[in-house]
Amino acid sequence: MADVREWRMHDVVDADGKKIGTLESVYVDTATDEPSFGTVTVGLPTRHRLVFVPLDGALVGPSYLKVAYPKSQVKDAPAIDTDAVLPAEEEPAVFAHYELPYTPGAGGERRLARR
């Protein structure tokens, strides 16, 4: 996968090409420093929020990032305010939403770090 950190502010679409929102930031796995989740801006212009989507299996297109999860699942994902960072205690819920295994980082530290 190309460096998805370069694709901030590009459209995020699902496997069917349906636009989900705009890639706002990338969270890396603290154990590998590899991109793990992206946050996508969704909602009405006056009520934007950021939802999390796994980047595993994502494909980069000319002006978009195609993720492997349906729009409906991404829109229902755990969300944070546009100026917030995911609290460590909420990380397990993000993984659980996508039925992904969660293990804390080394020494019980957080698993995801915003880049």
Where are these regions (language model features)?
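Peripheral interaction segments used for macromolecular assembly
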Residues: 1-115
